[in-house]
């Protein structure tokens, strides 16, 4: 039950954020979008460092001076994995007119949902690999530290859910369809978490690689999508300030609960 709730919490965060479309106006002010993107980026960077990369290095201490090796290898595999998906899957970022990925005849709203779905894959994997480490009896990953990551991801999923559902509504979708599209984009987190737990149980020695893999994938999303989004236009410093807020919050959660 503890693990089930842990992997469900981020999805709940997404769903609550998506629900904003049911009672808010169709669009968010640009300053609000930048603030939300900055906050999400801060949480993801802190989670990648404190919850994923540092534990990956600590679990490889038996390798001595080469303890960094699993973290570096896993990190790069994660980056390349997301880079590959980014090129293969047609998607459209919120606020952009130009689609990315392979050429497709998919509609704008479908490609917007796919963009957020891509974003959610590494988040689900990150939560899954933490709970996999806890299940494996890894002394450096506790139920509290896994919960801290789950809560952090859920907190940043709330504004993320609003960021996707409101533009879908602005594109002409009904409130119901905009809500459903946002929720579906979050389902991939549940799937990613479950599959990662299963994979990690089968190859427990690979846990440091899986931790850093999730970190690499998350940081790819931050640099490729969130940092540009939080830095565009006037008053871009609001994105930087909220990045610091998100980073601090995730760091506090990890240290206080972990």
Give the predicted meaning of each segment.
Residues 1-258:
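Intrinsically disordered, metal-sensing/regulatory segments
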């Amino acid at each position: 039950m503890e693990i089930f709730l842990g992997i469900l919490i981020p999805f709940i965060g997404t769903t609550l954020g998506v629900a904003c479309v049911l009672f808010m106006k169709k669009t968010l002010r640009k300053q609000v979008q930048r603030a939300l993107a900055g906050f999400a980026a801060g949480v993801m960077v802190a989670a990648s460092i404190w919850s994923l990369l540092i534990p990956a290095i600590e679990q490889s201490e038996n390798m001595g001076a080469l303890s960094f090796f699993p973290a570096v290898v896993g990190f790069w595999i994660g980056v390349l994995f997301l880079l590959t998906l980014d090129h293969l899957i047609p998607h459209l970022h919120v606020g952009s007119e130009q689609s990315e990925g392979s050429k497709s005849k998919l509609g704008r709203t479908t490609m917007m949902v796919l963009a957020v779905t891509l974003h959610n894959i590494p988040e689900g994997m990150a939560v899954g690999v933490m709970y996999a480490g806890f299940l494996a009896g890894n002394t450096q990953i506790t139920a509290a530290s896994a919960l801290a990551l789950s809560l952090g991801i859920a907190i940043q999923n709330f504004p993320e859910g609003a960021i996707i559902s409101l533009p879908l509504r602005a594109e002409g979708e009904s409130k119901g369809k905009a809500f459903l599209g946002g929720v579906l984009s979050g389902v991939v987190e549940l799937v990613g978490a479950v599959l990662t737990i299963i994979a990690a149980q089968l190859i427990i020695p690979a846990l440091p690689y899986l931790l850093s893999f999730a970190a690499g994938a998350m940081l790819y999303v931050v640099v490729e999508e969130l940092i540009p989004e939080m830095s565009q236009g006037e008053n871009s410093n609001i994105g930087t300030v909220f990045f610091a807020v998100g980073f601090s919050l995730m760091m506090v959660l990890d240290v206080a609960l972990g």
